[in-house]
Amino acid sequence: MHHQQRLRANGGRGGTGLGAGSGPVSGGHSPLCAHCRGQLLPHPEEPIVMALGQQWHCDCFRCSVCEGHLHNWYFEREGLLYCREDYYGRFGDACQQCMAVITGPVMVAGEHKFHPECFCCTACGSFIGEGESYALVERSKLYCGQCYGKRSCQPADAKARITTAGKPMHSIRLVEIPKDATPGLRVDGVALDDGCPTVRITDLFCNFFLWLTSMAEQCCGAPYRIDVNLTNLHIGDRILEVNGTPVSDSSVEQIDKLIRSNEKMLQLTVEHDPVQVCRSCSQADIQRAMSASTLILPLSTSASSVEVGRERLYKTPGEQGTKARKLRQATNASTTIPPAAGATAMTQLKEKERCSSLSKLLDEQHQAQQHSAHPQLYDLSRTQSCRVVQKPQRIFRATDLVIGEKLGEGFFGKVFKVTHRQSGEVMVLKELHRADEEAQRNFIKEVAVLRLLDHRHVLKFIGVLYKDKKLHMVTEYVAGGCLKELIHDPAQVLPWPQRVRLARDIACGMSYLHSMNIIHRDLNSMNCLVREDRSVIVADFGLARSVDAPRLPSGNMTPGGYGSGANSDAPMSPSGTLRRSKSRQRRQRYTVVGNPYWMAPEMMKGLKYDEKVDVFSFGIMLCEIIGRVEADPDFMPRNSDFSLNQQEFREKFCAQCPEPFVKVAFVCCDLNPDMRPCFETLHVWLQRLADDLAADRVPPERLLHEIETFQEWYASSEDALSPTSQRSLNNLDELVKSAVDSEISPVEKEKENMVIKPQDIPKSPHLGKDFSPSGERLRDSMRARRRQRFLGAQEERRNLTPDTESKERALKKALKKCRPFGERGYLVDLRAGAELQLEDVRDLNTYSDVDSSCDTSLNYHDVNNLPAAQEDENTVKPGKEELLEESTNKPSNQESQHHRLAIDDMRTRLNQCRSKFEHLEEASRRNFNQSQHSMKNFFKTPPVALKMFQRLEHEAAALNGGNNCPPPPPRTQRINQTPIFGRKNPPVAIVGQKLQHAESLEDLASSGVAKQLATPAPKRSKATATTKGGQSSNPPLFLPPSLNISVALNSNGNVTTTTNTNSSCPPSASDWLPKKHKLTLPLPSAQQQRTSSNHRLPMCNNKGKTLKPLPSRTGSQGIPASNCVSPTRSSRPGSPTKHLAQRHTAATAQRLTNAAATHQQQHQQQSSKTTRLNILSPEKVHRLGARLTDQKQKMREEAAATASSVGGAGCAAGTAAGSLNGHRTIGSSGTPNSAVGERRRRAAPSPPVRTHFNTRC
């Protein structure tokens, strides 16, 4: 803190007059000095200084740095005393209250500065705003005007004052004076020999206030009194400011005129009692100062100008203090030393103090505190004397600057040209007119960045201005305008050497920025300013960002800034894998900011980026300078991937441009950020090119070769292709052929023209993650980028050349080192048994990719284990290589330490990856439980629509049952965290196939109508048997009722038939049986179906009964044999053995079902066609359901049309059918044995719907 000292000048009064808190000497104990801890003995020639509530010897009250006596000004910080020069030179502009360095707005009280939030009243705690009255007492206690007035009214004994002769305490106050009182104000100025002018208040002004006080007492009485202290003015007070304007360099006439011309309330900043007399000063200075009206002394006096020839009258009880103090105390302690010996000792004392250059600031505690606040300070104090400490940034007030013309206006603020009122310096004021939080944050960030920079090609920061409760920035003034105006001004002639120098200056400034770990992120031609000498500076750091990870120093870097291509082991880690590049160690996912015309592709796509985005912006600026064209894609040719169209740009704008300059622009605009050079390298290239062009020399081929081959050197020293790059094999033309040829072995030369198989290209070890753990979909997954690179490689391989094949081989070798273990993947195969199986996959690109929006919640086992032999090969070979490397190259201690650090870094990264994988596994485990239950429910309860196609499946299986074809290979689909089951197409629908309707009343009218099917269906009863007829290919037909067919078995085993008329055929059993009876019908095997189709007897029954006539409309259509049943099912038996017959029928049906199942199993083993229905996708189920609905609708329409056309014929046929005795069927037998078996079968009960049908008729 800063305080004002108080000195004892009362001579021989000894211990009287001590400050508050110290008290007089009592009880025989003398007080101790706060510095040397010596006794303060009462002596008339030994003054005692009282300050900060403590006492010092006058000789001990010195600056801790320069050892100068402190007379009227002193500063205290952390228990050490400083003079004003040393304090400001060491700590800069520090806040009076919190002792922190001020970097923003500032509140000034005299020469003491505060943060706005620290400028508050000590008594009430209220904040003191600009223009409000205040008082700074003892340079340490700040009061508002109201609290200071109350404190002044207190009794004198209640005031905590450090005083010597009853003088008031030192104070700096801001007072307000009414306009009517200004005519009585008189000022007087005195200039001493040191050139420090002062302006003080004369007694006329105070006499006026005394008169005003007396008049107020007479008019208003005793309760109302105007005290002079309340106005905060005293005789001899020093005026510091008038209405906020400093008066240090103003004359008395100017100040008097300013006071008289005031139309409002007059505000004065005054300093009360600023000077006290020090006994240690020379008498000549005192006499000269007393001759003037006021006394002004230098703020500090050096030790050489102070007379210290007197003897000290105290001894140091302890060993505290510096060596000089101990020597002085030991010399002055003895009073019996002769005068000659005393003079010799005093000379030695002075020499000892002169050689003591190490100050007390070098203790460990002080160093730690100082370096925490100022990290740029050096550890050794002796080196600080050799450094040139630059002048700290200034803090301006509104009255210091004169606003001039407006230079420009942007989205966040305005820019004005201002002139300093005193020095006449021309500067630029950037005002912020937006009050939102984002604008304030960006503005403060720009100020924080600029104040740390100091370079000739970077905009110079001068200071800040706090006006109207807003922060404004003051920078240097650049008269040339921005670079864009110079480029597009046709009146300006820009030769090629001048253009190269423009680019060189920008590269130099950006190289300095990147060395300070700052990314500009908004580099364009509008943010680069041109001086009058055509030099360029980089400006506008509102979007700049500090990089967290510092760049690692490169051990094998050439002066040009790139690695040596000969050292191929530099980028290898101890484990034999490629390290990550330095740029990718710094790469993070920052905000997308800047101008899109100059924005880098990785920033445009929202990927991770680093300082290389500034290199791409610089490349676009080089294209602007070369072609003097705007960066708008309408004028500058660009590609769809935001890169530069180099071929078109060269044809349009590079006719006369030097080739190295064009190459530099192209390499800066590379799509891969790792292939762009740093600004240090660019500055070296452009400097060499500028020197050659200035001397009218042709640029050497070596420079052009370095620029063209830079990418190979950079790739060999850092890393392979960046994962953020979208480049494929067609963009590898930049690789150097010499480096590739040097690594080709004889075995590889034999395989020169071999095409790389897809499974030979190693992939990323990460599974394609399209979703984050929180469920958000990623913008650009690794799987999509890998697929895109693979497709580009497939297209490129169609037209391979030896050149590209050699590059592919180099790429393969580099990728093999990066990803030696390939990528893990799974295949899902749904076989006939409906078992989910996973197969090992080493290459996922040969299979079709799936939609990334599928559910990723299914968990599966890890079955990607390599065979034992292959694993042995993969493990043994690296072991041999490691043994060879260890035997040939013995690493040194330094290399082993470097490898150890790399391993520790790798271990840390692996731990981070493991924690991420654990979170992903936990999330997938939770989702797996839900998906597992849903999958089980799906397999247990298939959709209802699947049951509708059960008969369709059996009919299709029966149709293809006779064809013995080999089983097709299992169909597999690629998955990546998502199972896809092998889907098989359903049985091919037969043309003209018609499915039966469910039983309903509207279908009863057409229940007797014939239905046509392309394939015969199995019969539903044991009582029916078929025999071979003359026309086996024609389907059986229902005959008219007048036709009776009787079947008899002769002695030769042949079947004889007798046809009679007046016989009717009942409808098919599948037409009138209920749904529950249909499901119990047996399913015959394919062999039985072939037998029944070969032995088919139409138009007859085995009882010799006549069949029911068929309507004329459908008489020509074929009816399958399954629609004709035995006559035992045509009518309900009336005998009491009805229940027994039904049970016999059920048992027979069960026997046939078992036999059919056995035949079906044998047939399934022999046949290659499975009869099990595959799991259909929802899309196929929907299509089959729609087809079923259409077929039902068509059947309803045909049934309605048939019923309307037949009319009464159907009713007559029904009446005739009801009069029969009910034992009619169409009988057929192929052999005598089958005929005998048919005789033993009993008839099924007649359908119950016949009586209801007859009733309706």
Swiss-Prot record:
Biased composition (Basic and acidic residues): 794-811
Residues of the LIM zinc-binding domain: 31-93, 94-154
Spans annotated as Interaction with LATS1: 1-147
Protein family according to the UniProt entry: Belongs to the protein kinase superfamily. TKL Ser/Thr protein kinase family.
Biased composition annotated in UniProt, kind: Gly residues: 11-24
A molecular function GO annotation: protein serine kinase activity
Keywords: ATP-binding, Cytoplasm, Kinase, LIM domain, Metal-binding, Nucleotide-binding, Phosphoprotein, Repeat, Serine/threonine-protein kinase, Transferase, Zinc
The protein, known as: LIM domain kinase 1
Superkingdom of the organism of origin: Eukaryota
Binding site residues for ATP: L407, G408, E409, G410, F411, F412, G413, K414, V415, K430
